[in-house]
Regions:
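Short acidic/histidine-rich motifs immediately flanking catalytic phosphotransfer sites
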Residues: 44-52, 68-74
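Short, acidic/turn-prone active-site loops that include or flank metal/cofactor-
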Residues: 32-35, 79-82, 103-104
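C-terminal substrate-binding/catalytic lobe of Rossmann-fold NAD(P)-dependent oxidoreductases
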Residues: 2-5, 10-45, 123-249
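Rossmann-fold NAD(P)-binding glycine/threonine-rich loop
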Residues: 58, 64-65, 78-98, 109, ...
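Rossmann-fold dehydrogenase core element
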Residues: 73, 88-105, 119-128
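Short hydrophobic/aromatic-enriched beta-strand-loop microsegments
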Residues: 26-28, 71-78, 97-100
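Short glycine-/small-residue-rich Rossmann-like dinucleotide-binding loops
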Residues: 55-56, 79, 180-182
């Protein structure tokens, strides 16, 4: 598998490191403004089977154009897209396979599956989503928190509430509280709290290093490389991992 890494910040470097450890061939690195690596996708001449993108939303048009022009699958793990940009990704997926997720860890894929099963059983519980990240993360709530919120909304009629300081009223049952913590060097922690009368249930995922996201991105690349055009997500990653586990058993 020949991989092009698009965006060579902290995550791009870790993807390269993990790829080499797994024996995956990194044939190109594109890092805008870099003197060390290729600056734009249009300059890439090396063979590429799949692109792993940890860049920023401003580079999305060039990324989608590159994938379509060269018929190359894309793993898009960049965060902070607008609804319009997500729509552009969905449109492009009609021509090429695209995996898009704000979080590429298998643990989050598993957490989403658990929510699909648990949320319909908790109609008498109030649900809150709490996420914590390092002090340098600029977007809040995190894309993963939003992903979890969408999973909850798919199973219950709730409305996300992002702040309560201006509200002077009791919490409504249909609210979905969203909370962000920023500090230190926290890689990423996401908790879904189900608060009932006299008891609480918590589902929690903690990333212990950024390697978990690199592993997931490479697994996603392997998952979609031979798939038909379409939009793929964490559910596909979970299904593939489950299939492999069952084969081993």
């Amino acid at each position: 598998m020949n991989v092009l890494i698009h965006g060579f910040g902290a995550m791009g470097r870790i993807v390269e490191e993990v790829a080499h450890a797994q024996g995956v061939n990194v044939t190109a690195i594109v890092s805008p403004g870099s003197d060390e690596h290729t600056a734009t996708l249009s300059e890439v001449e090396a063979p590429v089977d799949v692109v792993i993108d940890f860049s920023n939303p401003a580079l999305l048009p060039a990324l989608l154009a590159f994938g379509r022009e060269r018929n190359i699958p894309l793993v898009i793990a960049t965060t902070g897209f607008t609804p319009e940009e997500l729509a552009e990704i969905e449109t492009a997926s009609q021509d090429i396979p695209i995996f898009q997720s704000y979080n590429t860890s298998y643990g989050i894929a598993l957490l989403k599956q658990l929510l699909d099963q648990l949320v319909p059983l908790t109609l008498g519980y109030d649900i809150e989503v709490i996420e914590a990240h390092h002090r340098k993360k600029v977007d809040a709530p995190s894309g993963t928190a939003e992903l979890l919120a969408r999973a909850i909304e798919a199973k219950r009629d709730v409305t996300p509430i992002y702040e309560r300081t201006s509200r002077r009223e009791a919490r409504a049952t249909e609210e979905l509280g969203m909370h962000s913590i920023r500090g230190g060097t926290i890689f990423g922690e996401h908790t879904v709290l189900f608060a009932g009368d006299d008891e609480m249930i918590e589902l929690k995922h903690t990333a212990l290093s950024k390697r978990v996201f690199a592993n997931g991105a490479l697994a996603a690349a392997a998952t979609i490389i031979d798939r038909p055009a379409g939009l793929y997500n964490l559910s596909n990653l979970y299904e593939e991992a489950t299939h492999v586990t069952h084969k081993r058993l």
